């Protein structure tokens, strides 16, 4: 089980990730793992820190099945269940759902 909580202070900011990534809107989500999670200790909890002032650190490990790594800003993982489709994010207010990506 992966427990997720939003970081609304950075959610929805425009990305400075390379053009052509197919995503212009980001939802920042902080995550923690249950003690029995297979991802504990894999480095997934320790996302790359912000090294370029406004995003730019890359995630250090592959995402769990069904998730896409889109970038990392200020040490907060940014994910989406879709790479395009109107640039929807996992933010329920933007039409996405968290449960759909926790596969």
Swiss-Prot record:
One of its GO terms (biological process) is biological process involved in interaction with host. The lineage of its organism: Bacteria, Bacillati, Actinomycetota, Actinomycetes, Mycobacteriales. This is Uncharacterized protein Rv2929. Residues 1-20, 44-71 are annotated as: Disordered. The keyword Signal applies. Residues 1-34 form the signal peptide. Keywords: Signal.
